[in-house]
Amino acid sequence: MCGIVGALSLPGASLKMTESYITTMRDTMIHRGPDGGDTWIAEDATIGLGHRRLSIIDLSDAASQPMATADERYWLTYNGEIYNHQEIRAELIALGYSSWKTNHSDTEVILYAFAEWGIECVHKFRGMFAFALWDATLRELWLVRDRIGVKPLYYSTHHQRLVFAS
């Protein structure tokens, strides 16, 4: 089971996101992802994402998170498993998505599914999941979990920040 964390500075907040803030959040869940961890902080330091990794589907470093689309518009930290990710990937390839950095990462499928279909992509997913997806162009954060809530996702506001974790 992976661990995801993040924080978004609320409008008017004077606090900027720091790597140490996200890293501290992330590493409190080291038991949820012993295979590695990473963080991403936006250039303007208004949002940060973190991930503790338990490698299951794609064991390569290319599948590390947080992960971004090639144009870095979308950023994702994700925990779970999309059982039908190969079918969705084939559909995306048929639509012209031909540049993949991983061979079979369901994380990358979520990113490009969101790029193609927006939030409606979740209706295609069969599995258990929780994720945070940042749209850097629209400056929107999506916090999403599976229909039943198998993968937890908690959030709160704290010191002018929306904070969240699995």
Residue ranges, per PLM feature:
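Cysteine-centered catalytic environments shared across enzyme families
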Residues: 1-166
